[in-house]
């Protein structure tokens, strides 16, 4: 055991502690278990080792015996008063000294036998003294004995160490009055601790009196002042919260907030931006609309068809079909915002145009205007199937906006169950609802059902590819995009999606070729020649300013990422709006 933490100078207990710490290295490494917060390597350590020759022989004889430490048991720590008296007075003294008798009746052995009775008395007196000290709260450390009476060998060196150190210091243990020394030490420690406790209590009483005096004098005023400040702050926070509630209700009633926060698009905020009329070769052609339709049907460049429809609209701003075709073409040509504006204008002119509603719902979902998409789908269903259900429920309280999706889904599922045949448009709308909720597997099922009815719908093949890509099924998505391009080679959006899926599987060269092909489809005949004759003050970044949206932004940024993935910094430096695409034809096929 180690009692150095409780020593008080040069007293008998400190001397006894030094005796007990002898032979630390040898004993700590011979499996003597201990507890009480002492490190294993420093339990028994002494700077002096005095052992007689006879004693060394006895010690070697003892150390040669096997130790069955597997049977040792560690017991919970107990107070010093009870554990020391019982452990030392009881277990410690049940020592089988047959091994020492077998080594010969040496002087060392005779002295050990003579002092056994003395040690017994010492242990008993230590137990009684320790109990007294424990009752006075003098010591709070704990001692854990090993109580395996069948294996007492580890206790023998402990007794021998004490005896050897007593001889080295010239102590005669048989004549030492241990009880007197412990009584003296107990009185000394108790007096000191009682003095400190009394001093602490006195200081606490003094502090309490000072605190009471301060409260009765000036500090009470400061306390009340601080309390009033805290109370006023709480009242102010409450008033602010009430005002925030009113502001929040006003904000919910505000149209702009409804559009932004609830996923609604500000329809009137974006008008369609026409290309420069002076560059439109169809501007004065009376058959511009028919030309645009022919270009669409024959797979011509979508940019060419868009110019034809723009010319038709300039000639007749209320040309509903021209607005519809223009919106569809621009969306397919990767010009989503302009396409949405054209479709919204179409609905202003013809509120019941089902094709415009359907395509607008798709664009709203693509751009994140989910609430506008739900309302548009509801409007489409109410127009196509009037009286089927009460659409006014969706126009109810705004705090139920998160439930609109589930309501819309249930209604379209009910609509599917009531119609005997498969309606591709209903499957499309239902698939859009699943798509908006990231349920891509169910979306795929809806789109595949629609394709069974109309397998040559390139738009549906592209939508199926997007759903497959979002389900991490890039290989299947590529097949769907290829099918869409087989049906319509000028489908820029499908080609762009194909490039992205190719990137996802590491086919960077193929992705670059698809993107370069899509960029080449944005060029219309004579566009760059006309732009090159414009003033030098117009930068290349302004070449698409007339549309309000640079159509090549997505394509160019994606192409840059492809070149970065390929490690082609030399090609990366060439990518810019209005670049000459022929510079890439030596390495890429498009």
From Swiss-Prot:
Chain ranges for the short sequence motif WxxxF/Y motif 2 as given in the UniProt record: 139-143
Gene Ontology biological-process entries: protein import into peroxisome matrix, docking
Chief location bin: cytoplasm
Region annotation (Amphipathic helix 2 (AH2)) ranges: 56-74
Crosslinked residue numbers (Glycyl cysteine thioester (Cys-Gly) (interchain with G-Cter in ubiquitin)): 6
Start and end residues of each stretch annotated as Amphipathic helix 4 (AH4): 227-243
Intracellular or extracellular location(s): Cytoplasm, Cytosol; Peroxisome matrix
Pfam families for the chain: TPR_16 (PF13432)
Keywords: Cytoplasm, Isopeptide bond, Peroxisome, Protein transport, Repeat, Thioester bond, TPR repeat, Translocation, Transport, Ubl conjugation
PTM field: Monoubiquitinated at Cys-6 by PEX2 during PEX5 passage through the retrotranslocation channel: monoubiquitination acts as a signal for PEX5 extraction and is required for proper export from peroxisomes and recycling. When PEX5 recycling is compromised, polyubiquitinated at Lys-18 by PEX10 during its passage through the retrotranslocation channel, leading to its degradation.
Amphipathic helix 1 (AH1), as annotated region: 7-29
TPR repeat coordinates: 285-319, 320-353, 424-457, 459-491, 493-525
GO molecular function term, any single one: peroxisome matrix targeting signal-1 binding
Region annotation (Disordered) ranges: 18-45
Origin superkingdom: Eukaryota
SMART domains: TPR (SM00028)
Ranges annotated as biased composition (Polar residues): 18-30
Entry note about domains: The TPR repeats mediate interaction with proteins containing a C-terminal PTS1-type tripeptide peroxisomal targeting signal (SKL-type). The WxxxF/Y motifs mediate interaction with PEX14, promoting association with the PEX13-PEX14 docking complex.
Role, per record: Receptor that mediates peroxisomal import of proteins containing a C-terminal PTS1-type tripeptide peroxisomal targeting signal (SKL-type). Binds to cargo proteins containing a PTS1 peroxisomal targeting signal in the cytosol, and translocates them into the peroxisome matrix by passing through the PEX13-PEX14 docking complex along with cargo proteins. PEX5 receptor is then retrotranslocated into the cytosol, leading to release of bound cargo in the peroxisome matrix, and reset for a subsequent peroxisome import cycle.
UniProt similarity note: Belongs to the peroxisomal targeting signal receptor family.
Name of the protein described by the UniProt record: Peroxisomal targeting signal receptor
Naturally occurring in which organism (per UniProt): Candida glabrata (strain ATCC 2001 / BCRC 20586 / JCM 3761 / NBRC 0622 / NRRL Y-65 / CBS 138) (Yeast)
Designated gene of the protein: PEX5
